[in-house]
């Protein structure tokens, strides 16, 4: 659904002696234009965890370029202060003409965007015109519509996958947009050489504006990610990941594979199943070819197993999302905890950790590879159950004093060794 940006421009002429005005034959100081934004959205927000409309509203110090079909000088620049835009040097036209408005200006460079959600609003190119010709002496009303879409780039890790976003369209590599003269639209500027729209090294979620309605091909570090035939819809946002968020890897140097999923950008890649048998801490912390599944896998650290926030609140632990949600679930007749990603690009990814017991009373322990106290291991200890359709947890914590005896064996959920 296209988001329309609407603002009203009210024009007033102030009379002062000593300043000539050839259009009106009188002595005036000029014309002041005030603009009021009718869009109630915040500066820049998304309407959901995945693709959907991108909401925008003007902020203080935003500028709009306004001109008409007879204006031979530069565009009038209106600046927002409080609830209104104003331009003290703007003047009404001598005859009824069409007026055009462009945000954030008549030129919008798209290279080297910052990637943050608030900053992408500065590249949110919009254009509009008056519904009918007017001098503007009694006020202007202009409805602006977006001419760009928003790409939400999910960089999946900190090092192995680059984030160097370049986009092509007919004519070359996209570099920016330029307002069309006396048309409520922008032309797409291209370059024969590669142009970087976004470059980031840290895992995370980043946002860039790209021309809407144009066939584009998206590249990351020279690798083709996506291509569109008709172009993206103006005013919407689309999620693109720089690498896979699920896959598979072999175990024990055989052809047998185990699937993995990543639950947040920069997070570990969890196997979708446990090691078959419970393990001692000594075996769980082996690495390389000595590891139970071979060198492609390892036991996660305490930090990597910290998927949610858990805080003791009275007699029970309060569980709130950190990287994932957590809920008691059942899979193939086995009770356990379902962890589902909450970061954009990961909301469809989840892992299921089986526990002993049933939905009314589940319990169990998972090893981490972390040792915080000499001769002890660190385990995730959980006791929980469902009461009156509510998940409750008498225990959900990391135990830094877990025994490392040969008789102490816990579950292990490996992660990919990278």
Regions found by a protein language model. Give the residues of each.
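Short glycine-aromatic motifs
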Residues: 78, 124-129, 260, 297, ...
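Short, surface-exposed beta-strand/loop micro-motifs that present aromatic residues
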Residues: 255-266, 365-368
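Short, solvent-exposed loop/edge-beta patches enriched in aromatic
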Residues: 95-97, 293-295, 416-418
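Short consensus segments that form the blades of beta-propeller domains
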Residues: 52-57, 288-291, 402-405
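Conserved SET/PR-domain catalytic core that frames the SAM/AdoMet-binding pocket
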Residues: 147-160, 264-275, 291-314
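C-terminal, surface-exposed recognition/capping segments
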Residues: 268, 274-278, 283-286, 302-418
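Sec-type signal peptide cleavage vicinity
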Residues: 2-12, 16-257, 270
